[in-house]
Regions:
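Second-shell loop/turn segments in exported
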Residues: 18-22, 60-69, 98, 136-144, ...
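Soluble non-cytosolic domains of exported or imported proteins
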Residues: 23, 66-74, 88, 103-107, ...
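Beta-strand segments within the central parallel beta-sheet cores of soluble alpha/beta enzyme folds
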Residues: 46-50, 91-100, 125-127
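Metal-dependent peptidase/peptidase-like ectodomains
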Residues: 99-198
Length: 233
């Protein structure tokens, strides 16, 4: 089979005009909460769970974003509730961060890396969630400098979740397309967690009817145990 690039030089130059509204006073909000670690010393180290809370909105019809990225927000909040009630107490503190402005150019994650609320060297991992509500298998993307994060996520899956898991080691970073890439580029130990499968992307049909509850539940359990293993290592 011969593969051809889908992009090519046409030799033409195009000029595009568009009407847009610019609001210099527009603001976004990152929302953070924390469960303090149980160890008197290790509680001063942090595991951050992040998921962007925004989507496209009206363009001009409603793009609900059930998978991208409400599924991740639901998983993060589910883990926050489970950890708060669990008898297994994380030794390190867990920060839950709902990041704004991902679809508007990764503005929320970029803002956090420039204005961190806890010392960067005290963050032992960022677990960034992206689209965990559609598909049949789990995926993890991690920077090659932090293979232990992938190993702990694999351990969590093997012991408690038992789903097919694809892991990808990243050796270089190009133009960031996810908050996880922003955190990696800023030097944070970060792993992107997602679910793999064909779903609607930036499409009106990315709604609640497209969500697979089974994979969303599996991703939430996977996040829970991965967080426990990292926080207590």
């Amino acid at each position: 089979t011969t593969l051809f690039r889908s992009s090519f030089h046409t030799g033409k130059r195009a000029h595009i005009k568009m009407n847009a509204t610019y609001n210099p006073n527009a603001t976004g909000k990152n929302i953070l909460g924390m469960i303090k670690g149980s160890d008197p010393i290790l509680c001063n180290e942090y595991v951050i769970i992040s998921a962007h809370l925004d989507h496209l909105g009206m363009i001009p019809f409603l793009i609900e974003g059930a998978n991208d990225n409400n599924s991740s927000s639901a998983a993060m909040l589910g883990v926050a509730e489970a950890l708060a009630k669990s008898k297994i107490k994380p030794k390190r503190s867990i920060i839950f961060m709902s990041v704004d402005g991902e679809e508007a150019g990764l503005t929320g994650s970029t803002y956090y890396t420039n204005h961190p609320l806890v010392p960067k060297d005290k963050v032992i991992a960022i677990l960034n969630l992206e689209q965990v509500g559609v598909g049949q298998m789990l995926g993890a993307n991690y920077h090659y400098k932090y293979p232990e994060l992938a190993k702990l996520s694999q351990k969590a899956n093997a012991m408690y979740v038992h789903r097919r898991l694809f892991t990808n080691e990243t050796h270089f970073l190009t133009r960031p397309r996810t908050d996880g890439a922003v955190f990696m580029k800023a030097g944070y130990p970060c792993i992107d967690l997602w679910a793999l499968g064909s779903g609607y992307y930036h499409h009106p049909k990315d709604n609640i009817r497209s969500i697979n509850p089974d994979i969303l539940r599996a991703a939430t359990e996977w996040l829970y145990w991965t967080t426990i293993f990292i926080a207590n290592k």
